[in-house]
Design a protein with these regions (language model features):
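Conserved protein kinase catalytic core
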Residues: 8, 19, 65-67
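S-adenosyl-L-methionine-dependent methyltransferase catalytic module, highlighting the catalytic core
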Residues: 37-47, 51-141
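A short acidic, Gly/Pro-enriched loop at the edge of an enzyme's catalytic core
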Residues: 12-27
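Histidine- and/or cysteine-centered catalytic micro-motif in compact active-site loops
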Residues: 3-4, 32, 61-63
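Short, flexible active-site loop motifs that bind/organize anionic cofactors or intermediates
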Residues: 14, 29-32, 89
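Class I SAM-dependent methyltransferase SAM/SAH-binding core
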Residues: 1-16
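A short SAM/SAH-binding and catalytic strip from SAM-dependent methyltransferases
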Residues: 25-37
């Protein structure tokens, strides 16, 4: 699913998904939450559509030098967003508090560092960002 992509089989806004609650076993949301107006609302929607016992992988760009996510309504032009959030269409720049934001909607979060354990040739082959943490978010039973 995607809001814009012509290849998506379902067009949707992740902040208001047209699915019943407890519909999916797995949700993968890769570098989307930094683009939406309300990431907390989107996280809550993902939590809602997951079945109990299901999990989501929710990846975002993170500036690990930041303790807290930078999110300021006065950063509201493409130029300012690029300057502060590193991309013209981003709504925020996540910090080390990202997992806490996920927990705030009910997820149990596992910060998985598996990329660090892979041989460099596989990291390069699959274009994995070195040091990227996988945020595996479980919905309790």
């Amino acid at each position: 699913a995607d809001l814009i992509s012509p290849w998506a089989d379902v067009k949707l806004d992740v902040q208001a998904m047209p699915f019943p609650s407890s519909q999916f076993d797995v949700v993968i949301c890769n570098h989307v939450l930094e683009h939406v107006q309300s990431d907390i609302k989107a996280m809550g929607e993902i939590y809602r559509v997951l079945k109990p016992g299901g999990f989501a992988i929710l990846q975002v760009p993170i500036d690990i030098s930041r303790e807290k996510t930078l999110e300021d309504p006065s950063i509201n032009t493409p130029e300012l967003r690029e300057q502060y959030y590193l991309q013209r269409d981003h709504q925020r720049l996540y910090g080390r508090d990202y997992a806490d934001r996920l927990r705030s909607v009910g997820f149990r979060v596992d910060e998985n560092h598996f990329v660090d354990e892979l041989p460099l040739n596989l990291v390069e082959r699959y274009a994995l960002p070195v040091g990227e943490v996988l945020f595996i978010c479980n919905k309790p039973d």
